[in-house]
Amino acid sequence: MGHSGREERIKDIFKELTSKELTPGLLLTLQKLAQKPNTNLEQFIASCKALTKLSSNNPIIFNELLELLKNKSEEDSTGPKKIAPSINKRKKFKIQLDLDDNEDELDSPVQKKPAPTRTLFKRIDKLKAKQLRQYSPTVKDPSPNSEQQTQNGHAETKDYEPTRSEVVEEDREWYDNDDDYGNLVPEPLSELPEEAKLLPVIRNIDNDDALRNTVQLYPIPLKQRMEWIPPFLSKFALENKVPTSIIIGSISETSSQVSALSMVNPFRNPDSEFSANAKRGSKLVALRRINMEHIQQSRDNTTVLNTAMGEVLGLENNNKAKDKSNQKICDDTALFTPSKDDIKHTKEQLPVFRCRSQLLSLIRENQVVVIIGETGSGKTTQLAQYLYEEGYANDRGKSIVVTQPRRVAAISVAKRVAMEMQVPLGKEVGYSIRFEDVTDSECTKLKFVTDGILLRETLLDDTLDKYSCVIIDEAHERSLNTDILLGFFKILLARRRDLKLIITSATMNAKKFSAFFGNAPQFTIPGRTFPVQTIYTSNPVQDYVEAAVSQAVKIHLANDCSSGDILIFMTGQEDIETTFDTLQEKFLQVYSKKFGTANFEEINDIEILPIYSALPADLQFKIFQDLHGTKRKIIIATNIAETSLTIKGIRYVIDCGYSKLKVYNPKIGLDSLVITPISKANADQRSGRAGRTAPGTAYRLYTEDTFKEDMYLQTIPEIQRTNLSNTLLLLKSLDVTDELSKFPFIDKPPLQTFLSSLYELWFIGAIDTSGQLTPLGLQMAKFPLQPSLSKILLIAVRNGCSDEMLTIVSMLSVPQVFYRPKERQKEADIARNKFFIAKSDHLTLLNVFEQWRANNFSSHWCNKHFVQYKSLVRARDIRDQLLTILKSQKIPVISSGKDWDIIKKCICSGFAHQAAKITGLRNYVHLKTGVSVQLHPTSALHGLGDLPPYVVYHELLMTSKEYICCVTSVDPFWLMEYGGLLYDIKRIKNDQEATTTGLFGEHYEHTLDKVEDDIDINIRRCKDMRDSVIQELKMTDNSNKEDKKQKTKKQNILNGKENSMKPFKRRKPFF
């Protein structure tokens, strides 16, 4: 077998063993293993398993691979020896744009560059040859211009249109999440910031393994970094008597003072049994998760889907039946338009109708009113109509705006109000969310928006002059944007006395809102609630899912179906699905013993219905259907059913006492979704669901002592448990106060989160050493993106890769791109792997979008390759929005072609503070904090044989472990260039560079050590850059001290404290 044939056979064998790519580094390692004389077949197989994931254990294949590697090693060793400069080992990648939907599989997106022929040179010094080999110039292919530009008008999908059942099965998470950024700011941008202009054009740096092993990065000690804090933060810390260590974050800092300034602990009593059970989670859920993994492994080994045997077994028919059932659901949910009389009758039955005149009178007499009303009182849909009828929208072209914390609420309420007013949606009544503006600037009088949209509108008009009345709905949810809006209006109302502000809330937080606005009057809409009996458990339950299932079965067996429906509160989707499955199993056991029932579908008096945000809208609709007492609905819901939904017929509530809360740790920059105890206010809201239509009963799966001692009075506001960098950048650009610390927060954020967010903005160049916005920061605030994403986009503009960066930033702004259906997880994993770009998840996302664009944005292509169609559509919308901003400034959008190192360095410029360094074979450690982290299993780097030494990541998430998500390999010199205040760099001397010892112990250095090579030059350049930043910090600090001294002297003169009779100077102490 020839040399080329042997190499092809090795690659074929490797493809049979694993789906991962055979990289040159991994191939070299395998050759070295095969060369060892004492390596037998078992040892070789074990070594291969340690290096990468394998899908086969066939010893025959491994034996063939071992022999081929031995022969290849011998051939390489007997070949002619040539001395030549090292070629560039970095792989060049090319996005494949010629894929066709008719092809069964994707071509590999990674194209290996053919090795150029080596040139013979004369023999030189061994050390000099090694240096030449390590630092030879990078061989670059010519970069063509952009192959394809994004068009505003997108190609229509000609080959396939999704059915309605497919559309409703798409992920609904985007519509149910908060709107953080809002719509496009059409204000024209000023010139490109000076910081972006002055950035050096990024040149490729050869990320050769030898170079990376020659230098090492280390975190700069905390004590040293504390000396490099910008003066405005040091001054703030000094004035507030807080340690400067909280500004930069330290996981080793455990003092009581620092703990009081850090994030709010989501557990009021962390040592209680109730809190411990929350941290452990449900055993039943964990057991189900393990069983599902075992079932999936069995399916993977014996899969018959889409085969002749699969058709015999009916697998394909089951999928078709599922589609039919989905279609049936869609038919059941067909919308109807009620008559005018029906609408009038429904509106008059609402509790708010009976107090209409008193409510409007109170609004006329006061600038701010707090309205308290339970879910179902009609405050959300009726209040805006009452104000419209009173003429608040007729004044000089002004309109009424209503904010909602969720997109789906803004859309649904706008549709309902338009139907009740019998006007077309988008005319008199409209809504505006990100990427959807269904309004008419001339005739829209009632506008429903997300709180993020209204917050972004303040950038265009800081007086909101076009609105006569603002309604902040569902304010008790205390979303971050709602809290910022409340602080903004507290400042604005003093300037606009004609503006009316109405805050609607459930009973929780109403007093706080009133006190915040100077004891504004409160108005309570009389409810129609009935008494609810609350029953606690006598002892703490060990498994809340098991206890909830048991209680639901008891209620159903002890009470007739006509007595009412059951609502079970759970923490999230996994808990809900486990409860759903376990309820079916338990009821089947009972009914099989009593009636001989063979399967759950034969039980005709129970309907179990889940409800959570990611569930398709048509399935969510089923919980509102009236079953007329023939069946009992058992609804399993998250806290979305506390206030956002009104479900008729609920008479029994089962409350597990927990919910999932997203918590941010500023010490390590970690977002984590944790199960925590609910608040007392949440518990009362849940219990109240049982008394909306008749007297009810609430079963609390915790003791009364737990309610009193382990639960906070109110839910922790989002502003006290989230990163504030984007919010603070927005407030800086609004310039509402001289200092951000003086902004009127209704609940102040933790001081550590506040200061660490400001430090992050300074670190990435958004604010200067005096705390003011830089030109770059001013431009960053114009983009509806997180600050780091805004920066990498602006840096990419200067470095000629803005076309690719537009796509990457857009893809990072949407939910999960890939999906794994339970019945086809192995197929989904294989399809996802084909998109992988080695050592970069960011470039993998770019690859996915480019492949989709090459296939005319086809939904059929997405379904075929297990890609979320709706996520890609959202990414395309975001990309168009950002492209419009760039084009309005006449900034060219340029492609870097094949040169992807430029893109990676631009990514590093915004995420240098989020870097990790490899330790051991497969683990990473956070380079700044020292926390051990792992690659997320969905990463393109996960399972690689040779992992890169340094990476940057987009997100750090904690589930069962600390995972870094969306990772890209970077050069250590890039990290030094953009993170020089966090890291130090050192050169590791090899054997030839080590000193030698003479006969009498004297040391002699190698003469070539004195010659400065490229690595030494780059190290010195990085340190010089850091020294210049430190010098600037010192100069600013000294200037501030001098200004303060002059100001004090001037004040003393004005106060008459300085006169000619000066006392003798005191002798300065010696210490």
UniProtKB/Swiss-Prot annotation:
Main location: nucleus
Sequence segments annotated as region (Disordered): 132-180, 1035-1071
Bias (Basic and acidic residues) ranges: 155-167
Key words, A-Z: ATP-binding, Helicase, Hydrolase, mRNA processing, mRNA splicing, Nucleotide-binding, Nucleus
Every Helicase ATP-binding domain range: 360-526
Note: Present with 1250 molecules/cell in log phase SD medium.
Protein name from the UniProt record: Pre-mRNA-splicing factor ATP-dependent RNA helicase PRP16
